[in-house]
Each structure stands twice: as structure tokens, then as C-alpha cells.
Amino acid sequence: MTLTIKEVTQLINAVNTIEELENHECFLDERKGVQNAIARRRKALEKEQALKEKYVEMTYFENEILKENPNAIICGIDEVGRGPLAGPVVACAPILNSNHNYLGLDDSKKVPVTKRLELNEALKNEVTAFAFGIATAEEIDEFNIYKATQIAMQRAIDGLSVQPTHLLIDAMTLDNALPQVSLIKGDARSVSIAAASIMAKVFRDDYMTQLSKDYPEYGFEKNAGYGTKQHLLAIDDIGIMKEHRKSFEPIKSLL
């Protein structure tokens, strides 16, 4: 009895590798619906394979540390919010489990919102430890954004319930005695830093969404404090509020 296209599609969607797909008994079925199902499954498997390969590449720096010290406790550190006109800069410091596998981890700006939220939930529930650090708009004005970012990162490290032995940091160096590696574009090169990027992004976006409930005119829930047209028009109309960075232009020129 010949299987229906729906039945064949279900079988094809259960295939886990391209090799298995090409050797599947339905591979030579010439029905258009079957061939379309095979093409879709191949595309999905190729995408998954690419994500797996990228994930392996992004464990390079962690593995180099573990070669030297198999018991190393590696903490990734990244920040979000250096560029906005309002709100804090937020850092996150996660320590991944040894069996971590979060396909799709990347620089948070490159990850779609739905996937970002999915990864964030998985990370919060499964990592060995994580903590956030915040430097306020007032501290950014007092110290400058670079120093405030360092402060936020150190606060995240200090908040950890597990003491790390090594730090992987996105494009920064910290006044910290622990061995540290600073990686340019680290959130696209290290799974630990990418995890920090995702978690910090979701945390800060949530913070700005909450802030928008008290200050709806600025559109913080959509612009996260960046200088969008709506945000700039609101500054012109109603002025600035406590979460605005007074050392940033164009706000600085308005004072």
C-alpha cells in the first residue's frame, strides 16, 4: 500500500541527518509533495548542521582554557546599552555548565527576538551561575561610558554565587586579578560571551519596557533608550527625565 504524502512527510521530518535523508526509502519517491518535503527537511538539517558547526567554533576559547586547566570555571562577560541616550548600561556574567549546548547563540543583535527569549529562559534555568551588573545613567555621566561599563561588568562578577577562575570578556579589560581574555566581537566568537550578550539584552529591554510605563512619551519599550525620532521629539516636547544621560548629545546641549 502506497503511503500518502502526509504520511511520508511525517517519516521524513523524523530523519535527523542528511545522510539518513538521502538513504531514506522515500528519497526516490517522485511525487512533487514528497520531493518538496524532502527539500524542506534538507534545508532544515543543513541549517541545524551550520548552527552546530558554528557552536563548536565558538567553544574554541573555552576549550583552550580547559586544556590548560580542566577544572577551570569560565565566566563570560558582556554588556548592553553603551549607545542609548537613556537608561543604564547592563552587564551579565554567566558561567555555563560543562555540557552546555545552546544552538543559535550569537551576538544578541543578530538573534531574532523569539529565539533570544527562548535562549534567555534556557540559560537562566540551566547555567551554573549568573549575575547582572548595572551602572546607572548618573554613573555614566560621572565616570564616562567606558568606565561605567567596567563598573557594571565588575558588579556582575561580584554578584556571582560561584567564584570563576577565568574571565572571557567582550572587548574590555577589567581591573581584576583573575586571568582574563578580551575578545573583539567576542559575542560572536565565544559561547560564554554570547550567553552574556543574550541575557544582558533581555534584562535591559525588560528594564526599559518597565520604564516606559512611567514615561510613555519616549517610546522606551520600542527604542530601548536609543535616539529614535519619537524619542528625540519627546525630549523636545517635554524635556529630559532622570534616566537620560546628560553627558550624551544632543541632551548635553539642551542643558
Curated annotation (Swiss-Prot):
Cofactor note: Manganese or magnesium. Binds 1 divalent metal ion per monomer in the absence of substrate. May bind a second metal ion after substrate binding.
Positions that bind a divalent metal cation: 78-79, 170
Pfam families to which the protein is assigned, alphabetical: RNase_HII
EC number: 3.1.26.4
Reaction catalysis annotation: Endonucleolytic cleavage to 5'-phosphomonoester
Keyword flag Transmembrane: no
UniProt GO BP: DNA replication, removal of RNA primer; mismatch repair
Entry GO CC: cytoplasm; ribonuclease H2 complex
InterPro entries: RNase_HII, RNase_HII/HIII, RNase_HII/HIII_dom, RNaseH-like_sf, RNaseH_sf
Keyword annotations from UniProtKB, A to Z: Cytoplasm, Endonuclease, Hydrolase, Manganese, Metal-binding, Nuclease
Domain RNase H type-2: 72-255
Role according to the record: Endonuclease that specifically degrades the RNA of RNA-DNA hybrids.
Family: Belongs to the RNase HII family.
Name used for this protein in its record: Ribonuclease HII
Highest classification ranks of the organism: Bacteria, Bacillati, Bacillota, Bacilli, Bacillales
